[in-house]
Amino acid sequence: MARQCHKWYLKLRFILLTLLALTLGNCLTIVLTETQVSNSISVYGVSGASCGSVINKSTELSANLVCNEHGIIVNASDISIAMNGYSIIGPGIQSTKSGIIVPDVDNVTVYGPGRIVAFQSGIFATGSNKVGVSSIFLDDNRIGVYLTGATNSTLEYNMMRNNELGIAAHSSREVLSNENYFYDNSLAGISFINTGDSTIALNYINGSQNGIFTDPSSFSNDISFNFLRNIIDINSANGLPNDITNNAYEGNYCELSLPSGICRGVTE
């Protein structure tokens, strides 16, 4: 079991680092293109953003977006994206595209109802502070919500289904995953790599290889009162003792954890 978990962890870390490199490369391409092309699309607080829109004020969708490129790129702080019941549909999980990109800005909220489907990352936030995602259906992406270098992110009341990873946080702090629903995300419902001071609470996670995974460099996280039905429900650094990671576990209804003793037992 330990050898199998170690191989799984190495595969997960490779995937996350590869996705980070590819997506950051695309972000750089976007920035360079905007500075060189005078007729790039920018949306200033209007309804009806289109694929590839760079938004500088709060925006509402007025139709579905079917994109062969990135969906929406946020270029300012203190704004919101209202999905208004519409969908952002991408070119597939093998692409390097994201439904919504939030790079190096603060206080951005994406709220539904709405759906983001068929991207490498449904929502990708890098270097940002106070990103909120609520009431969004993220399905058939490689990663539903991908946070890297982010702080104070709040993810609530979302449904994530048929992704490889529902939520993936890399080198982030103060992530809150609260009352989200995860179904059949193949690798993990929630994955933390080098992520700490975060809370995972009141989530329902079903049908993954690992329900919740934290690596050895993820410290001081509070993981409590989640309901899990997965191959491995809670995987803390492939079995590293909790007194080393300083992660706190309370009231999690599940059957199998690494190390043992975290689960309370699933009720029928």
Regions found by a protein language model. Name each.
Residues 1-36:
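Sec-dependent, cleavable N-terminal signal peptides
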Residues 29-47, 248-256:
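Short, polar/proline-rich extracytoplasmic segments that appear immediately after membrane translocation
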Residues 83-86, 109-116, 135-137, 145, ...:
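Extracellular beta-strand-rich, repetitive "passenger/adhesive" scaffolds
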Residues 37-62, 66-75, 263, 268:
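Acidic Gly/Asp/Thr-rich repetitive segments characteristic of extracellular carbohydrate-active
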Residues 214-268:
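Leucine-rich solenoid repeat scaffolds
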